[in-house]
């Protein structure tokens, strides 16, 4: 008990020293998060031993200390990567590397030099919202390299321009107007520029995407929001064919799935349907039929051979949808801990609009499996963050 008290006193003394030092060195910020992790590990150990108080400090619950320790580990990993990049030599304060700033929009990025802008709805100064435009945004791209960008504002929202010229919106003015405005009209003033959208019905569908709230060509910023919506609706008919979607998986405990009937394929006669003891006859599939099914074969009432043949038509996948940095962290974790539970995994990617390079929707990542059993095993083992959607599907070919 006394040794735990002494250890806690030492950790908190080191933290106070860092706070008073007010260092701008990223190494000190990494040290701070390491000390916070050690503090939570100590609390976790004490609680497991039934200790409810260390000195004057109340020991938090096991869940609380575990969650805070994981947060500290995550921040340490992000900051260590940033330190090893070309931006590690810049000045980094405690505020710059705080969890609150890291999760502020755009989330999972480091930010500096915040400036507040105001969006006024219905030309009523009392009906407004405020958002932050950042002078510097540090984000990771698809190959985990750190990049630096700056926020900007247009009539559609607040965004930052990525290194490949793609606008990544993190505030959608039209979506906000649909929530707070009676008329759908809003006005934004930023650095001497004034943006006002044209009148649009409040109950019309917002152009809501993670990457780009408008999904329209930047050259059409002066056009009406309603016209932009028509462009999006028209463009949606020409999106590339997506993997066949079956259903979303709820978070937490897996939901049992009832068997589905499988339609009879070309080349399958009555022999493929008949099953008479050991003399079961099955029709083998042609190479052209591989990967063409979009249904899961029934799990019961058939031999393993028949199931394998049916699965050959249906290479199963899952599509993970969420924030790009969240997906990158998840990919790193499952490659390190669950490499035997999947066949291959993609990099993060986005749909883009058919008229321009603006990104459409959340980031996505595909995981491919050799069988539905392997996919089920993967979903049973891997804990997916609540903010990441899981969609089951299949490729039209492998």
From Swiss-Prot:
Residues 258-271 have a biased composition (Basic and acidic residues). The gene is E2. It is found in: Host nucleus. Residues 197-228 have a biased composition (Polar residues). It comes from Human papillomavirus type 63. This is Regulatory protein E2. GO terms for biological process: DNA replication; DNA-templated transcription; regulation of DNA replication; viral DNA genome replication. Residues 1-205 are annotated as: Transactivation domain. Binds DNA as homodimer. Interacts with protein E1; this interaction greatly increases E1 DNA-binding activity. Interacts with protein L1; this interaction enhances E2-dependent replication and transcription activation. Interacts with protein L2; this interaction inhibits E2 transcriptional activity but not DNA replication function E2. Interacts with protein E7; this interaction inhibits E7 oncogenic activity. Interacts with host TAF1; this interaction modulates E2-dependent transcriptional regulation. Interacts with host BRD4; this interaction mediates E2 transcriptional activation function. Belongs to the papillomaviridae E2 protein family.
